[in-house]
Amino acid sequence: FVRDYMKWIGHSEFGLDYRIINPSNLLYPNEKEFNHWLEQWYLTYKSVLELSVKYEEFYLIGYESLCGNPKVWINVKDLLGINQETKYLFKETKKVIGQTFDNNLSDKCYRLYESLVSKSFGI
């Protein structure tokens, strides 16, 4: 059921039905390599950043902010007009990845991440 459900709602970004989100001009087309996933992250969130510039009513919400500052969740609820008391325990986990990776690509990702954070709502 889970696999069918994920197909029905269009999730193919990982798992058995994985399809590359950004297939053009890849430096790392092999999905078994860590750099492939890093590159896909970069290409996906680069598009997200471009959308946030293009559309005024586009809000980025940093998960780390949700985890580290309960006021962020209150601000999100206020923005959406949610008056109901809903409590979520957002928990940030930090995983040390013991993989080798392309340092230039990693640096590009980090700079993009910093740009996303600087445009995040609710900080």
Model-inferred region functions:
Residues V2-I123:
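PAPS-dependent sulfotransferases, especially Golgi type II membrane carbohydrate sulfotransferases
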